[in-house]
């Protein structure tokens, strides 16, 4: 369905690959097998697929377009990826999304546990932003003002939106 939508929009898909791995060696191999005429990397799916696509964009210095199918975390927009390196999960630098396309009907159709996980991820930002500032004040980290602003806006939007349950129309607005 998505491929036909891209085609109808005049977007030529040069390479289509279904991933079942986040092993860094596999991702590197796939990234450098992409045609040289590739203009962007699109990640459509859950966390593993998004992380793999982000890292491919990073390696090839290409824009990365994120198309998440669940809202279990905000990883679809972050500039890091969780990959397997020597069979261990590691966080590596990746490409921040150039654009994010979200079909709220797809997000709504995901299992509720993913929405609750996303709520937990959002609520944790409230304290993590203060932790980040504290670390910066004590020389343990550097604050990225843009990332801080985006996170604060997301938290403020979430806590100020008047919804009672995840089924309310305003919840995913």
Predicted region positions:
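ATP/NTP phosphate-donor binding region
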Residues: 1-40
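Short active-site-adjacent helix-start/loop capping segments
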Residues: 21-25, 50-52, 75
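Glycine-/small-residue-rich active-site loops that bind phosphorylated ligands and cofactors
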Residues: 21-22, 48, 71, 107
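A generic local structural motif
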Residues: 27-30, 50-52, 86-88
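A polyampholytic, Gly/Pro-enriched intrinsically disordered region
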Residues: 32-42, 84-93
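A short, small-residue-rich loop immediately preceding and capping a beta-strand
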Residues: 34-56, 60-71
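A glycine/threonine-rich phosphate-anchoring loop and its flanking beta-alpha core
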Residues: 58-160
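Oxyanion-binding "anion nests"
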Residues: 157-173
